[in-house]
Amino acid sequence: MIKPGIILGNIICLSGGFFLALNEKLSKIFFLKTVFGLILIISSSCILNNIIDRDIDKKMNRTKNRFLCINTNVFLLKILFFFSIILLILGLLVFYIYINFLCTIISFFGFFFYVYLYSYLFKRKTYFSTFVGSVSGSLPPIIGYVAVNNCLNRCCTILFFMFSFWQIAHSYSIIIYRYSDYKLLNLPVFPILYGKLKTIIFISICILNLFFFNFLLYFFGYVKFFYFLYTSFFIFLWFIFSFLSNSRYFTIKIWSRIMFFFSIFIIFMISFLMSLNNF
């Protein structure tokens, strides 16, 4: 229901932004409160996403055994809905009371984009849903950064574009790997509407943009050279591999699965090296 993998990934991204901004000592409790607030809001988002997507999930091999696909009791849905609202309110209160008002606004903004705009409004209607979803996916490192600095600046803008482009490339890799499921549901996603080849080209463009905005972090002095060197190397490898979908060594299904895991590795390394930047 609460998708532990998504929560863990977002905690890692938040940590990257948090420690990137950290120039002086803050208590460990402050960091844990920031993480706790994020966990509450993402848990709420995941529950509501499962409620909204339960009819789609029933038809997909990857998701057909999820809790709400098996248990369709209306009373249960109401309980889960109210529980998710409680989690949202608690998360916002944690940010408002213990962190700052700006984090509260940004986290609610992410919730709104993911639950209402992406899951409810756009996912079944337009391929732009992926871009809308990437907005919410880009916010955890910004929340971490703002928790420390209590301001939005140029670094936040760079982080926004970095993580948005990563999110799109990551999502399209999943869709290509699960292509038959999305084709069966006839969801209006880019790979179904425009084909795998154009999607692969678009993935490469997104990775190139990630490389560019990652460079801007170094260019404007937000990160040290060691961060730029190592992250550039890993992003470059990901970029090169994005051109190997039609090679004799991989089927496109195997390629897309490797791209998916590669993307997870990339975002982990970016966030991890950000966390080390000021140490």
Curated annotation (Swiss-Prot):
Protein name: Protoheme IX farnesyltransferase
Pathway the protein acts in: Porphyrin-containing compound metabolism; heme O biosynthesis; heme O from protoheme: step 1/1
Domain of life: Bacteria
Membrane topology field: Multi-pass membrane protein
Role according to the record: Converts heme B (protoheme IX) to heme O by substitution of the vinyl group on carbon 2 of heme B porphyrin ring with a hydroxyethyl farnesyl side group.
GO molecular function: protoheme IX farnesyltransferase activity
Chemical reaction(s) catalysed: heme b + (2E,6E)-farnesyl diphosphate + H2O = Fe(II)-heme o + diphosphate
Other remarks on this protein: Carbon 2 of the heme B porphyrin ring is defined according to the Fischer nomenclature.
Lineage of origin: Bacteria, Pseudomonadati, Pseudomonadota, Gammaproteobacteria, Enterobacterales
A cellular component annotation (GO) from this entry: plasma membrane
The entry's keywords: Cell membrane, Heme biosynthesis, Membrane, Transferase, Transmembrane, Transmembrane helix
EC identifiers of the protein: 2.5.1.141
Organism name: Buchnera aphidicola subsp. Cinara cedri (strain Cc)
Transmembrane segments: 1-21, 29-49, 79-99, 101-121, 128-148, 156-176, 200-220, 225-245, 254-274
Cellular localization per UniProt: Cell membrane
Catalytic class of the enzyme: transferase
Family: Belongs to the UbiA prenyltransferase family. Protoheme IX farnesyltransferase subfamily.
Biological process terms in GO annotation: heme O biosynthetic process
